[in-house]
Amino acid sequence: MPVSAFLVNSTNLFNMLWRKFNGDPIELPIAHAVENAIRRETENGFHLKVCIGTDSQVKGIETEFATVIVFLREGHGGFMFIHNEKTRTQYSIKERMLVEVAKSIEIAYELCNLFTRYNVDMEVHADINTNPHFKSNDALKEAMGYILGMGFAFKAKPEAFASSSCANKVVN
């Protein structure tokens, strides 16, 4: 099944609800909030890198997805914006991994011009294991091809902390 098929029911990017890690809602459209964050941090002298990742957790008949935009300040910690959504769609493990990647790419694509304009490095992180003994590895080639084919830097486990640590914390 093509990955684009997974996004048919995707929420419109402009209607997505985002929040900060402390739970405060982000009232602005996400592109405006990201631009404001970039401006604020660069005005404060920080060089930023952004990592975008998604993780999911099956909870009964629902699957919860969390997508994060992680802002790293070189040598000075970071912060993130979070979006959650739930679906009752049933996925195989491979399909779920590819839906996670598609959700991350959707956000990365919408924001990449901002990152280019402000000279911010960006990576897309996939919660996919590079070890073939893990089931998620079945999606590695497709995920890597999708992310690299879109022109984005790609990270998988164990380097994919945005998805495997940050987004994982949100869904667990």
Residue spans for each PLM region:
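Short, low-complexity, polybasic intrinsically disordered segments
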Residues: 129-160
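N-terminal targeting/trafficking signals and adjacent low-complexity tails
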Residues: 13-21, 133-134, 148-149, 172
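Basic, amphipathic N-terminal segments that precede the first structured/catalytic domain
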Residues: 6-50
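Short glycine-rich, basic-tinged beta-strand/loop micro-motifs
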Residues: 119-130
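A short acidic (Asp/Glu
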Residues: 61-65, 132-139, 166-167
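C-terminal edge-of-domain segments
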Residues: 64, 159-172
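Acidic, metal-ligating active-site segments
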Residues: 52-53, 57-80
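Acidic helix/loop or adjacent segment enriched in Glu/Asp that either coordinates divalent metal
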Residues: 87-116
